Regions:
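Conserved beta-alpha-beta core of the PfkB/ribokinase-like small-molecule kinase fold
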Residues: 2-81, 97-98
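Conserved phosphate-binding/catalytic region of the ribokinase-like
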Residues: 19-20, 71-184
Length: 184
């Protein structure tokens, strides 16, 4: 997501890959919007992100990303608007507050872990890795699995995502945890 989806040829290549694989593979997108990189191309960037969200199964957005994309309002209502575009689950991170997993029928939350923050670079990517690993561990990382996520799977995804992100932000240099640090 983010920077790689701003300029061609990378942006159109990633979008073409997503289009080609969307029917056969679980697709996750984390737009990771960086305003400094989209200045002057905001309309085309928003259009590309809109198309890619519509083809994704899983969308991860920070609260700031969601407000940029969908406007002001209640986060859960805005996330439901994202789900109306096609994805099956929205992971919504709120930094030190924690993270949400939202589907058409479920809304789950995991509070952030209290840590001394050294560096926030990589927190979102590490959350994504933890959430995806948890879904994989539960046998839910398939088109069918994502379409019928239950509370236990969402809770597991949030728990591992939040745990992994907490470890990452507690040390400098976007240094994600090893499996043994997560009890995995």
């Amino acid at each position: 997501g983010g920077i790689s989806l701003v300029n061609d040829p990378a942006a159109s290549t990633y979008e073409a890959l997503q289009t080609r694989e969307a029917g056969a593979r679980v697709i996750m997108i984390d737009p990771n919007i960086r305003l400094g990189f989209i200045a002057g191309v905001e309309d085309s960037y928003r259009a590309r992100i809109t198309r890619m969200i519509a083809r994704a199964d899983i969308v991860k957005l920070s609260d700031e990303d969601l407000h940029w994309f969908a406007g002001a309002g209640d986060l859960h209502a805005l996330a439901q608007g994202i789900l109306d575009m096609g994805p099956k689950v929205v992971f919504l991170t709120e930094g030190a507050k924690g993270a949400h997993a939202i589907t058409k029928t479920l809304a789950r939350f995991a509070p952030a872990r209290s840590v001394t923050v050294a560096d926030t670079v990589g927190a979102g990517d590490t959350f994504n890795a933890g959430a995806l690993a948890a879904l994989h561990n539960r046998g839910a990382l398939s088109k069918a699995g994502i379409a019928q996520l239950d509370a236990g799977s969402l809770d597991a995804a949030l728990a591992l995502g939040v745990q992994a992100a907490a470890i990452t932000v507690s040390r400098a240099g976007a240094n994600p945890p090893w499996a043994h640090e997560l009890g995995a």
